[in-house]
Amino acid sequence: MADSSFDIVSKVDRQEVDNALNQAAKELATRFDFRGTDTTIAWKGDEAIELTSSTEERVKAAVDVFKEKLIRRDISMKAFDAGEPQASGKTYKVNGTLKQGISSENAKKITKLIRDEGPKGVKTQIQGDEIRVSSKKRDDLQAVIAMLKQADLDVALQFVNYR
């Protein structure tokens, strides 16, 4: 019998983030408490999002609105890293970044966790920014997925290519 396997990745669907950004921009444009504050939210490059407003508390509230929209679109908060508000002339800015891929440090933590606490006979391989987990039994793979969902890791994980 062939080995069963799955891949652990950390990727964000850019289209879903774009939808959340557009929903947040629409809400910021129409909400009463944001009137006259020149609050904007926009892409800044491929992985960065910039929020600007006239006051520090309004830019923090704009970040909260954006995070709420991300949650509604099933995007983990671990995938979005919002910076601190920075004064820039008469406005305040917050630069946020999307975290994609599993760093080698986090990959080592995850493989060590699987080796130490996972079922016996489960093998892991680090392949760039993803991890391949294989085993003879599919039940062991499902146990690994359940264990990783319960673990408190600082990376948003998705499980793909389950075969």
Curated annotation (Swiss-Prot):
GO molecular function, one term: nucleotide binding
One of the Pfam families matching this protein, by short name: DUF520
UniProtKB keywords: Nucleotide-binding
Family stated for the protein in its record: Belongs to the YajQ family.
Protein name, entry field: Nucleotide-binding protein MAV_4575
Annotated coiled-coil segments of the chain: none
Annotated SUPFAM superfamilies: YajQ-like
Function: Nucleotide-binding protein.
Keyword Coiled coil recorded: no
Superkingdom per UniProt: Bacteria
One GO cellular component term: cytosol
Ribosomal protein among keywords: no
HAMAP family tied to this protein: YajQ
InterPro entries according to UniProt: DUF520, UPF0234-like_C, UPF0234_N, YajQ-like_sf
